[in-house]
């Protein structure tokens, strides 16, 4: 299939290739241990970090008053990543862009074995940004932390020489579009599902024990508060005024 994206090296002034070479060139001057660390981070480290943030988000969502809704939002993160990866399959075949080091052998490649795979869009970048955007809708602090890892992921993919900058940006855009555009449909399915799970044997996956206990105490306290309010209202009722006759008798 003909390549739809122009060859990134077609012109010496191509900013796509220029930025890639600038970042990848750092690897040539870096010590071997740093190259190995960045390569591991680019392939696995960022994903482990995002998984840890997702776990923290899930634990926090279970303790919220709207736990089923919050947990549904967290659950949408990995599902959105899966949808993004499926959407990328036809996109990558349509664009048919080879890895940058295939057409530019002068690049310093730190992650071998990707010669037969396509470059656009970056799967790792799409996965990272998909998690970040989905978590941001549930917890802004954790979403921003995941977003920082997603940006670091993009830098690492350039550092190891396996993607062009536009591959990374394409991954970011694809994941963001999937998360935001499909979120209403996903939540329409996931929220009722999480509510149903919260009423069954899998309730601990959706609602933490402390949150469940607090909710139960609030439900028990509400009728008591209403009864107490009614009694207080009766106690505050005005006393009947004494007649003038009693005053004269005094």
Language-model features: where?
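Membrane-helix interface segments
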Residues: 65-72, 101, 139-145
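Multi-pass membrane proteins that catalyze or facilitate reactions on polyprenyl-/lipid-phosphate substrates
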Residues: 2-4, 11-16, 70, 74, ...
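Interfacial segments of alpha-helical transmembrane regions
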Residues: 56-87
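N-terminal transmembrane-helix/juxtamembrane module of multi-pass inner/ER membrane proteins
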Residues: 1-50, 88-115, 201-210, 236, ...
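Hydrophobic alpha-helical transmembrane segments
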Residues: 42-61, 124
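Transmembrane alpha-helical segments of multi-pass membrane transport proteins and ion-pumping complexes
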Residues: 81, 85-89, 93, 176-184
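Membrane-embedded catalytic cores of phosphoryl/pyrophosphoryl-handling enzymes
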Residues: 111-219
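Membrane-helix interfacial "entry" motifs
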Residues: 28-36, 65, 69, 73, ...
